[in-house]
Design a protein with these regions (language model features):
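Thiamine diphosphate
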Residues: 3-6, 162-173
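Catalytic alpha/beta active-site cores
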Residues: 1-124, 142-145, 149-158
Length: 173
């Protein structure tokens, strides 16, 4: 998808440093939850960290990855497992980028997450609060991040499709 955005921007004379958007190029969730992967994990992670590097240099407003817990939850995990697997995937991507020589203080501020929300209102709120604290702790304690923006757990939430019911005409009586 990023290549398409780049091609269109070049065709229309738009500088890459003006582009903004988000990729959900989270290959590890495909292995865990969906089974729709094409390439093995190692080359897939290399491609992802290559995108981190390319965006770091050429597209500074681009959110380099949206790491998905949504699909993991829809595949049957608990909310605790959703966070655990999502952050395990995130740690893998961050470690790979650091091993490539990238600075987590810089690229870390453009990582985002995609979480699921089920019907347990208070439990879900607690999960989101815990996610913010856990991610900040992971970035600070494990990777030595000091940039406050790179410590933020930025995320999008969507209603879990598995919590929706089929049409039931008596629900609104």
């Amino acid at each position: 998808m990023l290549a398409f955005y780049i091609a269109v921007s070049e065709k229309h004379g738009v500088s890459l440093n003006k582009l903004s958007g988000t990729l959900q190029n989270d290959i590890l969730k495909e292995y865990i939850a969906r089974g729709t992967y094409i390439y093995p994990p190692k080359p897939s992670i290399k491609l992802i960290t290559d995108i981190f590097e390319f965006c770091d240099i050429h597209i500074p407003k681009w959110n380099i990855i949206s790491i998905s817990g949504y699909h993991i939850r829809e595949a049957g995990s608990t909310l605790e497992q959703e966070l655990a697997f999502t952050f395990a995937n995130a740690i893998t991507y961050v470690e790979s980028a650091i091993n490539k020589g990238l600075d987590p203080n810089k690229f870390g501020q453009r990582i985002s997450f995609f979480f699921n929300s089920h019907n347990g209102f208070l439990e879900e709120i607690s999960k989101f609060r815990a996610a913010r604290k856990l991610w900040a702790s992971i970035m600070k304690d494990r990777f030595g991040v000091t940039n406050k923006r790179a410590l933020m757990c930025r995320f999008h939430v969507q209603t879990g499709g598995s919590t929706l019911t089929a049409s039931q005409i008596d629900n609104n009586i």
